[in-house]
Amino acid sequence: MAYLKDYSSGRILLTIDGEYIKDYQTGRYKYRINGDKIVDYQTGRYLYDISGGYVKDYQTGRYLLTISSSQVKDYRSGLIIAQYDTSIIKDYRTGRMLYKIDGFLSGREITSLLAILFVV
């Protein structure tokens, strides 16, 4: 299990436990990672396909993000949005630390988390 925290306040925002991502404040499950797909937990609707280093809108088929080993890029413009490592996610333009990850995440879990954070 891992926690996503707001970097400046230290407040826990999400818990990531295997295939489930839960809102820490409400205790409600928000997303489920189903293989290479991210599913809205409440509705069961497929939201994103996260295969091959890309984040694609499941409904429209439109590519949204490119996720490499340390960066998140906007697919259309190619602009770097964020940088990350195993414990910190920061805004690329400002260098400001956005989120802290407490705990271990697999590659699939970190990709899913980045998709959820930066697509919306």
Pin down the residues of each PLM region:
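Long terminal segments
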Residues: M1-E19, Q25-R28, G35-D36, T43-R45, ...
